[in-house]
């Protein structure tokens, strides 16, 4: 449950970058863990940041934040069913912290979403929310992924002026 953030200087080459991207996006149960330099990585959204490095940016002295969300405005996670909780506990009996943090993730994630919305209201954050999200993190249909990319690109081009205004 520890957050690791890599910077440009931590990446040796394209292969190393690929490993680090995979490590940060690995989903428990759906993908195997990634091992880098003897350390096992399971999910970029499991550490203290819950996948959004707002506190790391604050620690670096930033007071304004440009945040790119992957879910529409208002999206919140829900508590896992008891059956799903039992599945995670069984699947990760050798790594109980993975199970427990995944099971409990919805509450701190939702609190972080609330905080981001507050920052946006005060002008301390500019947040890009996709108008729609027609794919999931398990989508493998190439055409659906291309359509989603094109939809997101069109929205970003539409919204760029708003970001430029916020940046001043």
Task: Pin down the residues of each PLM region.
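Patatin-like phospholipase
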Residues: 1-168
